[in-house]
Curated annotation (Swiss-Prot):
NCBIfam families: PRK13682.1-1, PRK13682.1-4
Domain of life: Bacteria
Top-level taxonomy: Bacteria, Pseudomonadati, Pseudomonadota, Betaproteobacteria, Burkholderiales
Protein topology in the membrane: Multi-pass membrane protein
Matches recorded under Pfam families: DUF1328 (PF07043)
The name this protein goes by in its record: UPF0391 membrane protein BP1737
Compartments, as annotated in UniProt: Cell membrane
Entry similarity comment: Belongs to the UPF0391 family.
Sorted UniProt keywords: Cell membrane, Membrane, Transmembrane, Transmembrane helix
Protein's UniProt keywords contain Transmembrane helix: yes
Positions of transmembrane segments: 5-25, 30-50
Length: 53
């Protein structure tokens, strides 16, 4: 349990450094693009599974 606490603490510190360092704006733009790319891929995968049967 202590291992997970340390891992999450390190992740929180990294997120804080990136968030307060100004990198968040660029990462948010990339995240929006990736969201729509993976949304389209998920829909294609679902439709492929439906029509395959």
């Amino acid at each position: 349990m202590l291992h997970y606490a340390v891992v999450f603490f390190v992740i929180a510190i990294i997120a804080a450094v990136l968030g307060f360092g100004g990198i968040a704006a660029g990462a948010a733009g990339i995240a929006k693009i990736l969201f729509f790319v993976f949304l389209v891929l998920a829909l294609l995968s679902i439709l492929g599974g439906v029509f395959r049967k």
